[in-house]
């Protein structure tokens, strides 16, 4: 079985009593690449060694679009950086946003709270 096929298998597998579904495997495989400048559906499919169409079908089966997947991955990384103490402006740049306000709006749209509420403040 190819690596991509293993990542995208439809059934859930048990691993030490914890269930992982296909979307968890996709997230894990793509997370290191999501901040690449040209990270698109084609690149994601290449990373996990499947066709673009196969990746689209698998995501659809899981009830998620590629854009939602990418946004969720970026949000996860942004949350981690904010919780580690990075400034909102630094995280905005790290995530590839052209402005702090653009990042703040996108973050609030996805989470319901502004990134400044997540950021760790120095004592």
Indicate where each model-derived feature is located:
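Basic, amphipathic alpha-helical hairpins
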Residues: 11, 27-39, 79-87
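Short, Lys/Arg-enriched, Trp-marked, Pro/Gly-tolerant hinge/linker segments that flank
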Residues: 6-25, 43, 61-68, 72
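Short alpha-helical "recognition helix" segments of helix-turn-helix
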Residues: 43-45, 91-92
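DNA major-groove recognition helix of helix-turn-helix
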Residues: 59, 66, 70, 106-107, ...
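Sequence-specific DNA-binding recognition helix
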Residues: 84-121
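Central "turn" residue of the DNA-binding helix-turn-helix
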Residues: 48-49, 60, 96-98
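Short, basic, alpha-helical segments at the C-terminal edge of helix-turn-helix-like DNA-binding modules
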Residues: 70-80, 117-123
